[in-house]
């Protein structure tokens, strides 16, 4: 327990001589942008750790953080943390940067075992066979009565905090070796670790939201829902609660009898899931209206009415959290709000994007990869026909249609192009004849002809798909172009449904995972150039294959040049990477 100025000075002097130390912050909450420091712990040798309490008084707290600033900002020292992005953001609240190389034990484990849990209590158990003190033992279970770390004395906290720093350092020593053994060093040190400060910077930047626009959309949607409800009641000839699946089932299947045999759950209730209703859309006009009502309700609840509540009082912005250790494929995910799930297919979903706006006096800039997954497929399979189409700069869907239907590219109809597009995207996800027929609303015969024609056109893609499955069968995992592994234990399952799912992953995970690797590499390069060229504009959001920026008018040309250059040169393949971009006064316009 380091609770005097003398002890602090001694600890700092020690830290400054070390090449490696772990750090951990104890705070008043889980949201790093608003959290206040309660204490900091450090460890530079196994079984030895130090806890520095930080008082509630802001001036005093700032003084203590400043004392340790030389250690945090020492370029040469490796900083080790468990979810270190959180600690970086908290220290950032006190104007302190964590500089130099990083090692995040949570991300290291994610790179090794993407499907497992990565929290420290779990890692300590499996790697150190050690039971950590759980936070609940200090502050009580989640809920109303839960205490705050601030309410506890330093004496009550220091063992827990020191343990965190010590365990983190021990885990690093083990995981470092594991990364070596598993050939995951390049991915970890060149992509995932340099990405950590980039994500911290994006979360710190936050994004502005047009609350006025959301309010209007909310009123507009609510009015529409009320109208739809009236229409539905009229069509049903009775008033009922649209939000109740039970009542919807009774109206559709008992009263209106829109199908002979309706699916029921174990409890004898009718199934009225999205899927079921979608398949019944053509049977009665009431179905489409119920679906529309549900869609609006979800948008209102998840985004339109929820976004204003997520605005940070101090900054006036929303600071989404980017999660680097969640998806099995290597993509980023985000929470509070989840940006990856904003529906863009339909007009209503687009209303949400309209509410995301740039900083005052700035413009919104959006850049996204054009057909990156198909390009990766062309590269991985080495298919000469597809590579040629991309090199010629052809519209890939039209080129596919021309080849499959054996006509010249200028004769391709819109419908043929649309079918080829469905095939292009469906087939790389390992879609079946049945699945394709359903998605395109055609019979199975036509779907089968399309798939056969597709593989005739791109024979090496079929080879690649078969090879991927064989490889996964043999070694139990697949890899992306940067060597990210995805384990597929079900690939040899006796159950054909389970096995089929693993087989589709064997085909798609290398493609989706490589796309994730590439955009991460691009983000790191853009961030580094923004820093070295002193760009004041900001990268604010990442969604799938798209990056979004808030840009100062005088930096427009410079930013566009940097972003497109770095996105297109993030990785060199047999086909060029292409990025499209747009400008606007909000996300929707720019996209």
Cite the ranges covered by each PLM segment.
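Conserved beta-strand -> loop -> alpha-helix junction used to position metal-binding or nucleic-acid-contacting
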Residues: 97-113, 127, 393-397
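Conserved "right-hand" nucleotidyltransferase catalytic core of DNA-directed polymerases
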Residues: 1-56, 70-73, 82-84, 98, ...
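Metal-dependent catalytic core segments for phosphate chemistry
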Residues: 20, 27-60, 121, 366, ...
